[in-house]
Each structure stands twice: as C-alpha cells, then as structure tokens.
Amino acid sequence: MQDIKQFVESGQIARFPGGIHPPERKQPASEQPLRRVPYADELILPLRQHIGLSGQCTVRVGERVLKGQPLTDAALHQGLPLHAPTSGTVKAIEQRPMSHASGLPEQAIVITPDGEDKWRERQPRPDYQQRDKAELLDIIQAAGVAGLGGAGFPTSQKLAQQKPVSYLIINGVECEPYICADDRLMREHARDIVLGMRILAYITGTDKTLLAIEDNKPEAIDSMRVAIAEYDDIELRIVPTKYPSGGEKQLIQLLTGHEVPSKQLPIEMGIIMQNVGTAFAVKEAVIDDKPLIERVVTLTGECIEQPGNVWSPLGTPVDALLEYAGFKPEQQQRVIMGGPMMGFTLPITAVPVIKTTNCILVPSTRELPPPGDEMACIRCGACAEVCPATLQPQQLQWLAKAKDYPALEENNLFDCIECGACAFVCPSEIPLVHYYRQAKSQMRNQAREQAKAELAKKRFEARQARLEREKEERLERHRKAAEARKQMQQQQAQEASEQPSDNDGKSSAVAAAIARAKAKKAAQEDGSSTPAQPADAEPEQKSKKSAAVAAAIERSKAKKAAQQTARESDVEAESPATEQQRPAQDKSAAVAAAIARAKKKKQAREQQTSDDRASQSPDQEDKQ
C-alpha cells in the first residue's frame, strides 16, 4: 500500500498491457449541447435494470402516478426501486421485449404520460454533511442509483463496503469510440459532478479523490479543472487515449502503478471507483431528492441526421429516440445499443432505454461494415497481444466451444472485461467476446444451480436434525412423565398404608365369622364331633384335626368288625350241627358271610365318602 501511495503522490501515469487505438469518431455528437427528448406515447420500464434482483410492483394497472414516485420496492439483496419518469397512468404490467441482444421479454411497467409532468413531494437536503453516512446510503438506494458507466451495480451496495478506502477514483475517461455522454455532462454540469464527488468522499471516508479524464476531451478537462480548484483533496489525472483505458482495473493500474490481482476487487486495495454520471446522479438523489429517472444518451452514426447527446427519460423506446434524431435507415440497417466495441445489435427497436444505456449507434454499412463470416483460427496470436487482462483469447475460445468450464475457470475467464479488443484485431473475424459471454452465462447458471442444490441439501439436513431433536425431546418428556406417575403412585400407596381405614377391622371380623360357619357346616356333614376350627388356624392344626378324625373312624370300623365276628362265633356254639344239618348250616353260614361282606363293603364305601368330605372341608376353609 505504501508503494501505491508513493506512486499516486508522484502524479505519474503508468501503462497497462495490450490495448488498441480504434477510430474515435466522437464528433460531431460531442459538439452539440445536451437536449431534452419529449416524452414518448408510452414509457416501458423493465423491473430489473441493474445487477441484482428486481423489486415487486407497488402500483396497479389504471393507477395514476406522479413523477419520481416509486413503482417497485427494493429487493432484499442488491435491489433497487424503480421510479416514474413523469406523471401519468399505469397502462399495463406485462411482458415486453428487453434491451438485450436476445430480445427476450421480461416483466415491465408501461406508463402513459399525461403531459403534466407533476412531481411528487420532494425534500431537498443541502446539508448532507450533517447527516449520518448510513442515512445517505439509504437515500441513494431509495433513489435507485446504479452505476451508469458499466454493468449497473447498485451504488449503495458498492459504497457500503466495510473496508477502509484510501482512494476514490472518479472515471471520466469514456474511451470507447462514438460515445461522448460523459464528455458533454462534464462540460455542462461540472459543479454538480463535483458535489456528487464530495458526497461520495464523505460516505467512503477517503482523504484523496482522483478524477481521471482522457486527453482527447480538452473542453471537459478545462471545465472540471475549474470546478475542483477550491478542493485540495481532489486531484485531476489526464490519461493518454487508448482503448480500454476506461476499464476499472486498467484505470487503477494507470493511476496507481499496480494491477488488481486476479479474482479480487479494487476494494481489496483500498480503492473504490465511480463514473462521473454516477456522481451526478448521487448529487441529484441526496441534495435535490431526485431519483434516477433519466440519463444522458449519445445518439450517433451516419444514419442519423441530428447526432448529439440527449436527456432521455428511462423507458423511452429506442424507435422514439431515432425518430427524434432524424433516423434514415438503409438496407440491412443495424441499430447498436452501446458502442461498436462492447455494444450489441438490437433485434428490434421497440425496446426501452434503461439505466445502463449510454449510446444508440446507427452506422451505415460503409461506416461500420457488418462482421464477415467466421473462419478458422490461424493462431497468429494478435488477440493475445492486445488483451489488457493478459489472457489467451484463442485458448479461451476453444475451451468455451468445448464447454470445458473447469478449464475456463483455471484460465481466468472471468478476468475478461469483454472489451472486444481481441475480436477487433482477429483476421479470421471470430466473434470471441460472443463465445466468452455465452460461457460466462452458462457457468453462472451452473453456479446458481449448484448453490440452490447446496441450499436445499442444508435445508434437508437441518430438517432431519430438527425432527430427530424433536423426537428425542418427545421421548425424554414421556420418560419423565412416566417417572412422575410412578413416583405419584408410590407416594399414594405409602400414604394409604400409613393411614388405615376404620372398615379394616370390620372386614376382618366378618371374614373370620364366615370361615367359622363354613368349618362348622363341613364338620356336621362328616358326622364328626370335632369342633370347627377357626378359618384363620395354622396349616399344622388343620392337618392334626384331619388325622384325628381319620383315626376315630378307623377305630369305629375295627370295633364293628370285632363285634360282628363275636356274634358269628356265638351262633355256631349254641347250635351244634348234626351230620344231616351241616349242609343247610353251611349254606346259611355262607349266606350270612356274604351278607356280612356286603355290609362291610357298604360301610367301607360310606366311610370313604365321609373321609373325602372331611378332607375337603379344611381345603375349602383355607381357600376362603
């Protein structure tokens, strides 16, 4: 950084590699004063006119709008609002062809001017130094200010860098042939541009501002030198005419003697660059409360009768501008938006002027012949010699045709500024920039799709983690609830055991009475005189009772058997049998013996029945 400071303080101008010197052809358009174009019958305002996202419509079809009224809100990221260039009625919100080489339609707001040109309420702010820097950034963003010298990057986003800024460079080089919009703006509005530069320096906090102008603009140089004379922190740098010395990285190398490293931004070196037209728009936004609703456009080419620079309301159709400038078409006429090096041929002229439109070029075929048929590369190397980014254009072209995007990335395709110097010197008339733009677009699309896929993957993983976390939390809640219920049940059981009920004694007495009644009944059925034992007797007492009953029954049986035997013996002794009576007596004895046996069997069965009942009665008492 010290080397940069020393080089800047020396006032030297360095050189950058490559570059060309095409015919300038800025006259006669640069010699005509600025004019104002009348409002067209309709103004077509695409929702997106800058790098970044488009906003959402805040108006409806049929609604009346005032000049400077916001038509859209700002998008969340790199968004800028759109404003009505004049008062009128919203005619439509529909798809219209856009200012692009493809001519593809995009969403646009169509306004029919009412001729009154009535402004919304405005609040001028001449005391910008009394306001907070963040507030000024909000004002610039709300005014829809985008870079007017390049791709249209939102100015507020560029100024809101969180890194220290050592140098603010204001680009007034305007190196491309034919284009002279910044030249006329510096000639006629030098003090307004300087005010915008002061606001930008205040926001960035830099102590040094460098104003760079190409040496082919002597009138603009004189005008700006007078305007900055009272400011010691603004220095004028006059750079030699060479294309593309107005490129951001090329101009930084000219003024600082150092090249911006590949894949880095100027802010990494402590530098911010803005166009002179952007500085003018910042002044109008902050001090005059005027949003970006118009810009200076160069109308030039041999097929225009009145070439010059005009204040064109944004949304003005190109065909309306051509009619105003006296357009006289010829066969196979080309209408180019931009310059001959970086511009593109419009497929139709019913497309609008947008924030990044700086020139409408209508050349004759003699003045600017159309490109011839593409031929094979002869490997002459001329394209590499003029490349200001020190790339290998022919190698990039082969890789772009092969769609070898990783190799294009390795060969620094995105360092290409699409200046067109390589195509300008190509003897085979290969549209090299066309291939680079296509490859860049496809690579950006791939990067966007990959970013979407990565985002979707992260969302899925986050969702799965959330579901798993919720499941674990749910299970933990259930576990804690079960433990709480278990503890509650144990506590209730403990409390119940510590506080017995009055009914417990009554229930025990009733159960004992029922048991005694059952035991008594069982004893009666068995014919036993053994008193019934209480139901709550021990198992050993019950067993002794059963054994006593069985022993008594056995003694009774033995006694009866002995008595029966004695009776039979007495009968035989009292009645001695004769020889003749013995058969009859034997027969009677056999009958008596059979009867006795039958009685014994009957008694045995009855005794067995009684024993069974006696044995069942204690079991039933135990169960009860």
Predicted regions and their residues:
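Hydrophobic alpha-helical positions that pack around
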Residues: 207-314, 318, 326-328
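Short, well-structured beta-strand-loop connectors
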Residues: 60-73, 92
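Gly-rich Lys/Arg/Thr-decorated short loops/hinges at beta-loop-alpha junctions or inter-strand turns
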Residues: 117-119, 147, 168-182, 303
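Ferredoxin-type iron-sulfur electron-transfer modules in oxidoreductases and energy-metabolism complexes
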Residues: 357-371, 384, 388-501
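Acidic low-complexity segments
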Residues: 92, 97-148
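N-terminal, Lys/Arg-enriched amphipathic/low-complexity engagement segments
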Residues: 1-58, 110
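Conserved hydrophobic positions within beta-strands
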Residues: 88-90
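Charge-dense, low-complexity intrinsically disordered regions
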Residues: 499-624
